[in-house]
């Protein structure tokens, strides 16, 4: 079974840098899907499995830390190379970022 699709599941704490990471991935040619509704994850998986659209060959799916386990479980075992990029930051860094906004 040849894997031709790559999915990076980007998750982490709010304010840790997910948006920065997805911008970099977009510059690398990934199609970015941000805050995809978790209730539609089954439809997303079905679409990815059958799609021949080249835009869906490289996908970065950004999700909240709360929804991460659901997406991770649903993406496990599909015909794609799935990687996880979990971004974290210390409490002091997160507090400083929130103070500056």
Model-derived features: where do they sit?
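Phosphate-binding P-loop
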Residues: 1-4
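Walker A (P-loop) ATP-phosphate-binding motif of ABC ATPase nucleotide-binding domains
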Residues: 7
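Hydrophobic anchor at the beta1->P-loop junction of P-loop NTPases
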Residues: 10
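Conserved glycine(s) of the Walker
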Residues: 16-17
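Post-Walker A alpha-helix
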Residues: 21-22
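Conserved nucleotide-sensing/catalytic segment adjacent to the nucleotide-binding pocket
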Residues: 32-79
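Conserved phosphate-donor/acceptor-positioning beta-strand/loop module used by diverse small-molecule
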Residues: 80-101
């Amino acid at each position: 079974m040849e894997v031709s699709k790559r999915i990076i599941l980007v998750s982490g704490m709010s304010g840790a840098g997910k948006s920065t990471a997805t911008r970099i991935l977009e510059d690398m040619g990934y199609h970015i899907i941000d805050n995809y509704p978790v209730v539609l994850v089954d439809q997303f998986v079905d679409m990815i499995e059958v799609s021949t659209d080249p835009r869906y060959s490289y996908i970065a799916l950004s999700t909240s830390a709360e929804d991460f386990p659901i997406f991770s479980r649903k993406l496990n075992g599909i015909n794609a190379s799935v990687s996880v990029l979990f971004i974290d930051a210390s409490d002091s860094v997160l507090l400083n970022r929130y103070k500056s906004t």
